[in-house]
């Protein structure tokens, strides 16, 4: 059984494109976390508590890139170079999404860029572009 049989996605790309970028980010957050957790289980022999600690480090790696202006600029510059025009549009829509809820340990700019990244991952996943999801996570996070 492949992923499309395990978790079928029935919506067409045109329908997915009409979704709120916050929906993409909601899915992207989950896909990103599952990818990191699976990677750690497959590549380490850590016990559950240590797995949790390590997975948090990968999430923080993304957030730290988004927190510090110089790191953020470098991350986005490198990240943007590899995106297609359509992907850049998805990132822009995710970054500009109007969310009225801000996590207490986050600032607005940090949250915007994290939402943009998660939005792209979610969008690509929903559009069944699994190879691209893997490529982005492996290149920029692992």
What residues fall within each predicted segment?
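Double-stranded RNA-binding/processing signature
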Residues: 1-142
């Amino acid at each position: 059984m492949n992923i499309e049989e395990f978790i079928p996605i029935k919506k067409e790309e045109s329908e997915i494109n009409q979704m709120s970028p916050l929906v993409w980010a909601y899915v992207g957050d989950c896909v990103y976390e599952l990818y990191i957790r699976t990677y750690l289980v497959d590549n380490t022999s850590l016990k559950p508590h240590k797995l949790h600690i390590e997975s948090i480090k990968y999430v923080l790696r993304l957030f730290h890139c988004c927190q510090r202006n110089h790191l953020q600029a470098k991350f986005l510059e490198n990240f943007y170079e590899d995106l297609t025009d359509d992907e850049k549009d998805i990132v822009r829509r995710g970054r500009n999404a109007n969310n009225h809820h801000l996590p207490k340990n986050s600032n607005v700019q940090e949250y915007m860029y994290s939402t943009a990244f998660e939005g792209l991952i979610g969008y690509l996943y929903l559009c069944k572009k699994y190879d691209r999801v893997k490529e982005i996570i492996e290149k920029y996070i692992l």
